[in-house]
Amino acid sequence: LEALQLERLKDMVAYAYDNTVYYKRAFDEAGVKPGDIESLDDIAKFPFCDKKTERETQHVGSFFGEMCSVPEEEVIFMATSSGSTGVPTVSPFTQEDFDLWQDTEARLFWQAGMRPNDRYVHGLNFALYVGGPDVIGAQRLGALAIWVGAVPSDRLLFVLKQYQPTIIWTSPSYAWHLGEIAKEKGFDPKEDFLSLIHI
């Protein structure tokens, strides 16, 4: 496993150096080259970026900034962080990135118990935050995806009763809140809703 990790690390560091303005400059300033990685421990010699650096470089130069490693025309999707700690940071995705993301999500859903005969409600928002397209991972697995998103609780309860999903993805606090609203509205979870797996 470590041999594979080392091989992938070497490839990634070389790719970053050869294809991004930021990492080439950062490595050169630190006096390191991709060829300096001979073991996994050698990663400690290389400079790391943080959120502050991401924000400072994301709009310098090209549209996606100095850290983007592909031309803008290869980007087919972009998302941003939530912005809870400052200016949102941008994540550009190529078609290959997007496909790998969906494959990864399908595997994660499978590990969480989702199967092709499941009905899945995505109860998180579909704004610029990267969570939205996870739904496609459920579809890739073969499950029925019900694209609800961030709707009022009354509407989500209607969807849960009407379409009887077997899986819902939302935050733990909102799942609790939804249960409280369901009680207030006179729903009986045992009778009105199927047994839900909460992801």
What are these regions (language model features)?
Residues 11, 30, 132-197:
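Conserved adenylate-forming
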Residues 44, 101-119, 153-165:
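Conserved ATP-dependent adenylate/AMP-binding module captured primarily in the ANL superfamily
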Residues 106-143:
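Conserved AMP-binding loop of ANL adenylate-forming enzymes
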Residues 16, 81, 120, 168:
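Residue-level signal for inorganic ion chemistry
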Residues 1-80, 86-103, 110-111:
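Nucleotide 5′-phosphate-binding alpha/beta core
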Residues 81, 197-199:
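Conserved small/polar residues in nucleotide/adenosyl-binding loops
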